[in-house]
């Protein structure tokens, strides 16, 4: 099980605005600053209201090295993420659709964030 992911982004403000809008349809709406004992003022976190598990760190991104997949509860949530992410400035890589070549019930979309990170949202029904 994965506890958290940290993406390096080139512009905090732009990326925080993008992810706040794009992840909202997935119920990932909690934006917080890291407040651990060891500092890290350069971390901004998103979560589900219980804990932060998706973090942004400002620096020099390497988007070719990153693919992050988020879980959606149904097809409508996949579609809503795709629209919200593109409306927030992301670039559609692949529109929402069934991917039976992966296996039956796989429905997903892919969007590139403002730095080019490859984001997937999938419902496995």
Named regions from a protein language model:
Residues 37-40, 62, 102-105:
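Short acidic/glycine-enriched loop/turn segments that link adjacent beta-strands
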Residues 5, 103-104, 110, 121-125:
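Short beta->alpha transition motifs characteristic of CBS
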Residues 27-34, 97-100, 122-125:
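Conserved catalytic-core motifs of GNAT/GCN5-like acyltransferases
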Residues 1-16, 68, 125:
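N-terminal beta-strand motif that seeds the catalytic metal site of vicinal oxygen chelate
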Residues 40-73, 77-82:
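Long, continuous compositionally biased terminal/linker segments
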Residues 8-51:
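Core segments of cupin and vicinal oxygen chelate
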Residues 10-13, 70-114:
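Vicinal oxygen chelate
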